[in-house]
């Protein structure tokens, strides 16, 4: 969820140099199926937490951009790479009106709200844990509980707000571990034994394999019930009917992207891969598909439970909020209603033209490279 897949040093440098922009809406050519002319397009500025857009993670945005779903919903989607050097950038930019929708981790979201940045989650991309721990292949660690007293590599010291609650959930005092802020080389630190573990996440595993890094993993979904990165907006916008309508339409486009992906994962991967020139230099189509499938399965967590795409799970959030309050990451126990809402999520799931997305996916023509790829047996979302 956090990093790119060309040379990691290059990507992080690019992220640190500033928030690169990519104008998704300008790439569209689809007509105005819902009676909205191109002149009436409203911009939604979405900001990544990674400092790069060159990853397969955002397939649920690239598909509606390239298939014209956002445009037919009256939206020009602008994707902003953000900055990897400022852990709170994806909420700060929203609060400062430099972006409309952020993609913060739960730790960044709650730390931001606690510090007075008035944002709220309207969409939990994964209603469960997305983060993992990467280990050297010869590591004797077999359980995440064995991380007590170990060295854990991070890309930024700001990622501590992500890992601390995970450790508490495991019964580990965060003060017992040593964090190694290794910048762009944080995964290499684990691979080479300079750290005992490194923070990782679904979607990254296949990308690292594509770079030749040899690692094994403690998969977070097997032992954690905490939530993951969300789409968050300004609280003040949720009191504005026009903004609520705009963001609900944006989420309808996201739902269509997910339904398209579910119906034809290889087509979604081809669309996303084709949108990312730097990624194509270092990741072959099969590994790109594998990376996307790791995340696509996770993105379907709440959908598979019958709660629709993007559901904020109250129980998981309540447990998480208590842990971060006990840790002192927040000065007080944040009220659940200050952190999440499912109001837009429920409407978006009902109103999205899922049937069109599925039909488009089934007739989408694969190129020879993606026609040769294979979807992992048992994949579901």
Model feature map: region roles:
Residues 1-10:
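Secretory targeting signals
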Residues 10-33:
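N-terminal export signals
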Residues 36-192, 196-202, 216-219, 223-225, ...:
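Short, glycine-/small- and polar/acidic-enriched structural segments
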Residues 125-135, 209-240, 247, 251:
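Periplasmic-binding protein-like
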Residues 178-181, 189-197, 208-217, 226, ...:
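A residue-level marker of the well-folded mature domains of exported/periplasmic proteins
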């Amino acid at each position: 969820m956090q990093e790119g897949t060309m040379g990691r040093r290059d990507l992080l440098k690019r992220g640190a140099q500033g928030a690169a922009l990519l104008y998704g809406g300008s790439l569209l050519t689809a007509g105005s199926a819902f009676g909205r002319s191109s002149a009436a397009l409203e911009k939604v500025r979405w900001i990544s937490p990674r400092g790069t857009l060159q990853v397969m993670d955002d397939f649920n945005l690239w598909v509606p951009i390239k298939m014209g779903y956002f445009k037919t919903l009256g939206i020009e989607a602008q994707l902003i790479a953000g900055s990897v050097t400022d852990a709170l950038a994806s909420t700060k930019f929203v609060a400062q009106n430099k972006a409309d929708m952020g993609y913060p981790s739960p730790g960044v979201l709650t730390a931001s709200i606690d510090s007075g940045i008035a944002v709220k989650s309207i969409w939990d991309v994964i209603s469960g844990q997305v983060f993992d721990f990467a280990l050297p292949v010869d590591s004797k660690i077999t359980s995440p509980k064995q991380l007590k007293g170990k060295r854990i590599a991070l890309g930024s010291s700001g990622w501590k707000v992500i890992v601390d609650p995970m450790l508490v959930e495991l019964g580990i005092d965060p003060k017992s571990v040593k964090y190694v802020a290794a910048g762009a080389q944080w995964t290499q630190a684990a691979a080479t034994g300079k750290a005992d573990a490194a923070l990782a996440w679904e979607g990254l595993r296949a990308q690292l394999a594509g770079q030749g890094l040899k690692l094994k993993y403690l998969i977070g979904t097997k032992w954690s019930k905490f939530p993951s990165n969300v789409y968050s907006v300004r609280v003040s916008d949720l009191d504005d009917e026009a903004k609520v309508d705009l963001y609900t339409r944006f989420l309808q486009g996201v739902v269509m992207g997910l339904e398209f992906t579910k119906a034809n994962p290889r087509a979604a991967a081809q669309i996303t891969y084709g949108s990312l020139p730097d990624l194509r230099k270092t990741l072959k189509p099969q590994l790109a598909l594998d990376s996307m499938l790791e995340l696509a399965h996770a993105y379907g967590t709440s959908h598979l439970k019958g709660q629709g795409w993007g559901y904020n799970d109250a129980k998981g959030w309540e447990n998480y909020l208590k842990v971060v309050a006990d840790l002192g990451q927040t000065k007080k126990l944040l009220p659940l209603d200050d952190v999440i809402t499912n109001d837009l999520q429920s409407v978006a799931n009902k109103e999205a033209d899922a049937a069109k997305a599925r039909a488009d996916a089934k007739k989408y023509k694969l190129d020879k490279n993606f026609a040769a790829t294979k979807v992992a047996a048992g994949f579901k979302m």
